[in-house]
Each structure stands twice: as structure tokens, then as C-alpha cells.
Amino acid sequence: MKKLFVTLCIALFSVGAFAQEKGDMAVGGSLNFNTKASMFGIGARYQYFFIDKLRGDGEFAYYFKKDGVSMFTILASANYLFNVADKINVYPIAGLGIAHSSASSDDYTVSYGGQTVHVSSDGASSTDFIGQIGAGGQYDFSDKVAGNFDAKLQFGHGTAFVLAAGIIYKF
């Protein structure tokens, strides 16, 4: 019985170890939410395994315009995957990138108490270097498709907490 248990444990850990090998790649998309700006966005990502369990993750996220402000981020991160159960990996996130935000120019009229004022503002934009730390989880639906969820703290362009849920295709 002990030999059977040990054999099953080795087989289980081997499945997790072979699921992510050096040279493996994946592409995917995500739905994002930036809590500081209360903005929803979409993301695209590319992942490459440098060595078993250690991957680089390149991500572009575009946040939909809200109150005249739009934003995007481009990030490069590193993740080390820990296999915690069959088909389930968790990983820390550490990365650097840029964040760009822009506010459109608006012309509007404000009326209050019988007074009418015309307000005009020029647009503005900002591009900053940012860092991020966080944690994520991945569930492998099959050998080729996985779902993931990330919770990240981004800093350098103000501090924002970002949640992202997505799906990736491995090849």
C-alpha cells in the first residue's frame, strides 16, 4: 500500500512539473478592474517559460474611457508557479512597466443660481514608469487552456489595486 501511495504521489507531482517546461509559451486575454480609477479594461498577454515553473509575462491593458479619462499599461512581470493541487498553480507577481493616462479636452456650460459660466479645458496626458507586486492563481482546464486570476498592487503612477481575470491558450 505504501508503494502504491508513493508511486501515485510521484506521478501527481510529475504531472504538475511537466505542465510548464522551459520554452513553453501562451497567449491570452483578460478583463481588468482598476480600483483607484474605478475603470474597467481589457488586456492581452504573452507568457514564456524561461525555465521550468519560472515564466515571463508581457501584458498590455487598455482601460475604457471614464469621465473623459482613458488609460493603458504595458508591463513585463516574472511569475514562479507553485503547483498546489492537480491543475491548480499559484504564483507571486513582480514587474515593471509604463502607465499612460490622458484626459480629453471638454467644453461645457455650467448654470447655477441664475449665473451661466462657460468652462473650457485643454486635454492633458501623463506617462510614468510603474512597478507592480501581487499574487495570482491559474486553473488548467486542459493541456492547452487555462483560466487565471491576478490581484496586483501597481505603484509609480499613483497607487492602484488591479484585479484581472482571464483565459490563456498554451502552445
Q: Residue ranges of each PLM-predicted region?
A:
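Cleavable N-terminal export/targeting peptides
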Residues: 1-23
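Transmembrane beta-strand segments of Gram-negative outer membrane beta-barrel proteins
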Residues: 20-33, 92
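Membrane-embedded beta-strand positions in outer-membrane beta-barrel channels/transporters
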Residues: 26-28, 43, 75-77, 132-134, ...
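Extracytoplasmic loops and strand-loop junctions of Gram-negative outer membrane beta-barrel proteins
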Residues: 27-29, 115-120, 148-149
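N-terminal targeting signals for Sec/Tat export/insertion, comprising classic cleavable signal peptides
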Residues: 28-55, 85
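Solvent-exposed loop/turn segments connecting transmembrane beta-strands
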Residues: 30-42, 63-71, 152-163
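Gram-negative (and chloroplast) outer-membrane scaffold detector with strong preference
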Residues: 47-112, 128, 139-143, 147, ...
